Amino acid sequence: MIKFHVTIAAVLQLCFLSVCAQAADAPPPDAFRVMPPMAAEKPTITPYLKYQTEMAWHEDDLRRASWEGIRTEADLLNMQRELLKRLLKMIGGLPIEKTPLNARVTGRIRMQGFHIEKLIFESLPGIYVAALVYVPDDAGKHPAVLVPSGHSTNGKAYYQALCQRLVQRGYVVISWDAFGQGERSQFWDEKNHKSRYNLICAEHAILGNLAYLAGTNLARWEIWDGIRAVDYLLTRDDVDPERINITGTSGGGFQTTLIAAVDSRIKVVAPSCYITALAMRVYNRIFKDPDSDPEQDLDGMILNGLDHPGLLLLMYPRPVFVSAAVLDFFPIEGTQQTVHEVERVYEKFGHADRIGMHAGYHGHQFSDENQEAAINFLDHFNGMPRQRSLPEVKQLDDQTLQCTRTGQVMLEYPNARSLMDVIRDYFEEHKTGPATTLKQIYYSKSYPGINSWRVSEYQGAAPGHNEILWEQMGSTRSGDVSIDRYLLHHSRYLAMPLLHIHKSSSDQRRVLLWLGESGKVRESDWSDVRKYLDAGYDIVSIDPRGLGETRMPYKAASPDDPLLGQMDFDRAYVSPISGVLADYVYNSVLTGRPYLLQMIEDVEIARRFAAEKMNRNSEFEVTGTGDAATLSRAVAETLPNIKLLPQPDAHVVKWSDLVEQKQELWPIEYLLPGGAYIH
């Protein structure tokens, strides 16, 4: 027994000495740093954000050029048809069948001159919508207004003042909770009486990210709720079917715009605090509004000409009134630019009076002055008597306005279905379609042609769009190992840190592309790196755009996501609910080249450099640690002459599994629209 203890002690001592020797052998941290240390944590316009913004403006330039071909009204109507076709494709189409609404009124509230009906209807079987219908007391047919809820924890109750003002002006008004808000939480924690996330944007992030993978968008079902709300209004004897209108603010402004774009039964459209120019939104969202809201970022939206001018063009020749806020996080300059552009089209064909705008000097809200301007516009085009002031409102508490006994439709109705189930079913219905591969997607029309880019030494000038300029940033020798540091300048704005780690021997060795979940090799990875070096590999390792040394030195902050503020910098940066990396990803979706494809581009750029500068034209291998195993597998499936060297504990994201298992949280950098269909 004594001998056994001695043997164990000796082994432990040897292991300890081995670990200490490896730690002592590790180069200093500066050996792995290519660029100067980042400035103190602060909002920063990074090269990658600049790159994304310029891409968005370039694509919008192409859209504006296409509008120059609108010479006749027939040209305009042809473009409308094409844009609508693209929009429907982006959201994955609409449900084919209008199933029974099964509408029921669960209660009534008497008010001065009107009453409020508490309504439940099913937009799809088992998808329950909680709505309030504000009805004037006077008999006869009335114009109607849809008021989709913006982002608020209490949903429709938050917008009751607008609804009361409209009903007192003579409109029948229907306002409903969006998915993930008010009485329609999809992730309700019954024990703690709250959402597992939050009822402002977080549930939208969970739903919307999964919908992307299934080749659709959360907007599909938000639009469908609105279409079915119109269907409901048309069942009422007190509604004039020729005078259906819509207005809403923030997320309700988004729904207002998209519902009206798709449903021509809506005659007058008045979005608030939504319309801008998306390239400006790309530029400021991280700093002003970092919460994830995927329904507003349709796949290829800017690329396909459906920036906000394109959406408004779908309204023509219907009257449109845009309410805006000068201090909004939807940039007012973009609002003015978009409205003026669409205004010129309306003027060109004799409808200048059908488009208007009002901006209040305040933050993100449907202020009283904006409401008054919008309601006056609605009155004019609905033949309502002109009034000069807003009527008073009586604020009711949330519980009074609840349509359900329990406060949540998912608790109230045993057959209620979660939208996560519906998204999974959508995928199951569509997965038998034509197969596609990641390689086909990567080399699609948006591929920048890296395989033909020129590689040369950096001389101080910005790189062109089709060249890789390498800059030597230093070298560190540690025993028999050298770490050469490079900065690869490319794509006009971007600079990618790269490490070439190799033994001093001049022998030709295999090249391993080493990918870490946070970027390139770090000091803490040295023991693993040493094993690969001893096994006959040279290592090339990079920081993909937006990661590692190219991270933005900023921790996004949002009053709508208090959990974000409680996270440390590293966790907050990659949060899929709200954060810098998530916004980078959504920006890439808008411009039609998802972030995952851009990370593969970075690996291809590194490979081109290694082949040309280091004269390594043989087959490469690639490996990834942690979540980067997904990227390494994607690289091996996509780029020629790169073989996967799997890690034994690798965790590879499989998009179809995420959808089928209704996974709520997963690494946001691997968001790939339609990824679940890749074979």
Where are the regions a protein language model picked out?
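Alpha/beta-hydrolase active-site loop signature
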Residues: 152, 178-183, 206, 276, ...
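Bacterial N-terminal signal peptides
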Residues: 7-18
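Primarily recognizes the serine-hydrolase "nucleophile elbow" in alpha/beta-hydrolase
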Residues: 228-303, 606-673
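Gly/Ser-rich "nucleophile elbow"/oxyanion-hole loop immediately N-terminal to the catalytic nucleophile
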Residues: 138, 192-249, 559-626
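The serine-hydrolase catalytic nucleophile loop
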Residues: 152-162, 178, 189-190, 517-530, ...
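Alpha/beta-hydrolase-fold serine-hydrolase catalytic core, especially in secreted/extracellular enzymes
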Residues: 24-128, 308-310, 316-512, 517-538, ...
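Short amphipathic alpha-helix adjacent to the substrate-entry channel of hydrolases
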Residues: 158-174, 183, 524-541
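Short beta-strand element of the alpha/beta-hydrolase
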Residues: 133-135, 141-150, 508-517
